C-alpha cells in the first residue's frame, strides 16, 4: 500500500514504552472467529471492527482509539475447532484521515463454508449470491487495508479471498488497495461453478507477500465437476461450463470471460527469510489475467501451477490465460506443470482425476517478460507450452527459460510479436515444433549472448512463417544454440543471421529449408567470426536453397565458417535453385562425410 502512516507518531513516549513492555499481541483487539462473523467498517470517526456473536453485535472498536496495539485487528480461533464464519471489509474502509493503517490479521483459523446441503438435496448449481456468502474473506471496493492470513486453512464453497467486491450493488469502479500476506496458509476450493482462490476484481491493486508454503487447491471442486460430466454423459447430455481458477485478476468473478479493467497483482517473496512459495493445484485454469490487467512476480517469489484441466470450460486446460502483461523478475520463479484439456474422467486408481490432452501452458495475447535472474519453466503440456496470439511477445533477459512440451514449445500466430532471448539460458523441447510462427507472421526471433537448445522430436526446431513471412531469425553476440530435430530451420524469414562470434549447431536430416520471406527469398548470412555447423544424418539435403519463389542466397564472410557433415549416407550437402547463390567472402566452407 502507498502512503503508509507512521503508526507511532501520535503515541507518547510513556505509552510506547508500556506497549513495548506488554507486547502488541497481549493488548490487541482479538476476535475468536468461531463466535461469529467479523466485520471491518468505517464511519465519520474512522475505521472500526466488530463481531456478530450469538448474543448480539459487539461494540465498535476504532483503529485509532486502540492505542495499546496500533489498531491491529486480530482474528484467531480456538484450537481444534472449525467454523463457517467469515470476515468482511466493507466498501471504502481506508482510515484515510486517521493515524493508522487498517491492519487485519487472521492467525490460525480453520474455516469451512463448503456445506451446500439442504433438507432435500444438494443443488447442482450454487446461486451467485450464495457463493458470495460462502466466500471466506471479502474486501469491498474502495477499501485500502493490510491483510495477513497466517497458519490457516480456508475451505470455501465460494471464493477464498475476494478483493474489490461491489457490496452495495452500486458498482462505482472504485480503486481497491490491499497488501495481502499469505503465511503457511491453504485455500481449498470445493465449488465447481465459477470460483477462485484469490480474486482481484476490476480496479484493484493487490500486493501479495508469500511467507512459508502456501496452497490453492481445487481438487474437490474438479472431482465434483468430473462426476457431473460423467453423469451428464450417461444421460446423453452435455455438462455446463465449470471454472475453478487459482487466481483471477480483473473482471468481476471467475468464468469463461477474460474481459476486465485495470486490475494489478504483484506477488512477492519474503525478503526477511527463506523464499516464500505458492502452489496452485487442481484447477481448470491456474491464473487468469484479464484484459487491461497485469501480474508481476518479484522479490524471489516462487509460484507453481500444477494439474490444470479444461473439462467443459472454454478457458480451462491452461496454466495461465494471459490477456494482460505477465512479468517474472528479481530472482523469481514461475513453474507450470501438467496441463490438460478435454473431458474430466474419474479413475479411483489415479486418485480420482485423469487428465486429458491439448492444454496450453500460457495462452498469451500480451507481453511476457522474464528478467533479473528469474526462471520460467513449463513442462507436461499436451499442447503448446506458450501459445502467442495477436499482440503477444516474449522477452527473456538475464534469466532462464525451460520448456518441455508434448505439443509445440512456443507457437505464435501470424499477428504475434517478437521473441527475444538476451543474456539468457534457453532450453525448449517440443514434439512437433520447438518454436513455430504461423503463415504470414512477422515475428523476429533473437538469441543475443544466449545459450541453449531448441529441439523437436517429430518436426522442426524453428519453424518460420511460410513464404511471405516478414520476420528475421538472429543469433548474435557470442550465442551458442543447438537445434536438434528432423529439420533444423524452416526459413520463411527474410533473413537468418548468425553473427558476432556465435555458433549454431544443427543435428538432424535437414539443416535449413529456404522458403522465402516477404521478398520471396531468404538470405542466410554467417558473419563476424561465427559458425553454422550442420551435423546431418539421413538421406536428405543439408541446405535446401531451391524452395523459395525468388532466388535465395548464402553469404559467409568475415572469417566465418559453414561446416556440413554427414554421419550416414546423405543427399547433396547444398542444393541451389535457379538463380540462388553461395558466396564465400573471407569465409570457409567445409563438407565431410557421405554426401552425394
Language-model-derived ranges and their functions:
Residues 142-143:
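Extracellular lectin-like interaction modules
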Residues 75, 79-82, 98-102, 106-131, ...:
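Beta-strand-rich solenoid/repeat architectures in extracellular/passenger domains
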Amino acid at each position: 500500500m502507498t502512503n503508509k502512516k507512521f503508526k507511532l507518531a501520535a503515541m507518547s513516549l510513556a505509552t510506547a514504552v508500556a506497549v513495548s513492555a506488554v507486547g502488541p499481541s497481549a493488548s490487541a483487539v482479538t476476535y475468536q472467529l468461531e463466535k461469529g462473523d467479523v466485520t471491518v467498517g468505517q464511519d465519520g470517526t474512522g475505521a472500526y471492527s466488530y463481531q456478530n456473536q450469538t448474543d448480539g453485535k459487539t461494540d465498535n472498536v476504532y483503529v485509532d482509539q486502540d492505542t495499546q496495539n496500533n489498531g491491529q485487528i486480530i482474528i484467531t480461533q480456538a484450537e481444534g475447532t472449525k467454523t463457517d464464519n467469515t470476515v468482511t471489509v466493507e466498501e471504502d474502509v481506508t482510515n484515510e484521515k486517521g493515524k493508522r493503517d487498517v491492519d487485519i490479521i487472521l492467525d490460525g483459523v480453520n474455516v469451512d463454508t463448503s456445506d451446500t446441503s439442504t433438507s432435500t438435496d444438494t443443488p447442482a448449481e450454487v446461486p451467485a449470491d450464495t457463493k458470495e456468502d460462502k466466500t471466506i474473506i471479502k474486501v469491498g471496493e474502495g477499501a485500502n487495508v493490510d491483510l495477513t492470513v497466517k497458519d490457516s486453512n480456508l475451505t470455501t464453497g465460494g471464493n477464498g479471498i475476494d478483493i474489490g467486491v461491489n457490496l452495495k450493488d452500486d458498482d462505482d469502479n472504485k480503486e481497491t488497495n490491499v497488501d495481502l500476506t499469505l503465511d503457511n496458509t491453504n485455500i481449498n476450493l470445493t465449488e465447481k461453478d465459477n470460483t477462485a482462490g484469490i480474486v482481484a476484481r476490476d480496479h484493484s491493486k493487490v500486493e501479495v507477500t508469500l511467507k512459508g508454503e502456501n496452497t490453492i487447491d481445487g481438487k474437490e471442486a474438479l472431482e465434483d465437476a468430473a462426476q457431473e460430466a460423467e453423469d451428464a454423459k450417461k444421460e446423453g447430455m452435455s455438462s455446463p461450463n465449470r471454472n475453478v481458477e487459482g487466481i483471477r485478476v480483473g473482471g468481476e468473478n471467475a468464468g469463461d470471460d477474460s474481459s476486465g479493467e485495470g486490475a494489478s497483482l504483484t506477488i512477492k517473496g519474503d525478503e526477511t527469510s527463506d523464499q516464500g512459495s505458492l502452489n496452485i493445484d487442481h484447477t481448470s485454469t491456474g491464473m487468469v489475467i484479464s484484459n487491461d490487467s497485469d501480474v508481476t512476480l518479484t522479490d524471489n517469489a516462487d509460484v507453481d501451477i500444477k494439474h490444470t484441466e479444461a473439462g467443459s470450460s472454454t478457458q480451462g486446460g491452461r496454466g495461465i490465460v494471459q490477456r494482460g502483461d505477465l512479468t517474472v523478475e528479481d530472482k523469481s520463479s514461475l513453474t507450470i506443470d501438467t496441463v490438460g484439456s478435454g473431458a474430466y474422467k474419474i479413475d479411483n486408481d489415479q486418485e480420482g482425476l485423469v487428465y486429458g490432452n491439448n492444454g496450453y501452458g500460457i495462452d498469451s495475447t500480451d507481453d511476457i517478460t522474464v528478467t533479473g535472474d528469474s526462471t520460467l519453466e513449463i513442462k507436461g503440456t499436451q499442447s503448446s507450452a506458450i501459445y502467442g496470439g495477436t499482440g503477444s511477445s516474449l522477452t527473456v533477459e538475464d534469466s532462464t527459460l525451460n520448456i518441455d512440451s508434448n505439443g509445440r514449445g512456443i507457437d505464435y500466430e501470424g499477428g504475434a510479436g517478437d521473441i527475444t532471448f538476451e543474456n539468457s539460458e534457453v532450453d525448449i523441447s517440443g514434439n512437433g515444433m520447438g518454436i513455430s510462427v504461423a503463415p504470414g507472421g512477422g515475428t523476429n526471433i533473437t538469441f543475443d549472448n544466449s545459450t541453449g537448445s531448441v529441439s523437436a522430436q517429430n518436426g522442426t526446431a524453428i519453424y518460420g512463417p511460410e513464404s511471405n513471412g516478414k520476420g528475421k531469425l538472429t543469433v548474435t553476440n557470442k550465442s551458442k544454440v543447438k537445434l536438434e530435430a528432423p529439420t533444423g530451420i524452416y526459413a520463411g524469414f527474410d533473413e537468418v543471421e548468425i553473427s558476432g562470434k556465435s555458433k549454431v549447431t544443427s543435428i538432424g536430416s535437414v539443416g535449413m529449408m529456404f522458403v522465402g520471406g516477404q521478398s520471396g527469398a531468404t538470405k542466410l548470412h554467417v558473419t563476424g567470426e561465427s559458425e553454422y555447423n550442420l551435423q546431418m544424418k539421413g538421406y536428405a539435403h543439408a541446405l535446401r536453397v531451391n524452395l523459395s519463389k525468388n532466388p535465395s542466397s548464402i553469404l559467409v564472410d568475415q572469417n566465418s565458417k559453414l561446416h556440413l557433415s554427414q554421419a550416414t549416407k546423405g543427399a547433396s550437402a547444398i542444393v541451389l535453385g535457379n538463380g540462388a547463390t553461395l558466396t564465400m567472402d573471407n569465409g570457409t566452407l567445409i563438407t565431410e562425410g557421405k554426401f552425394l
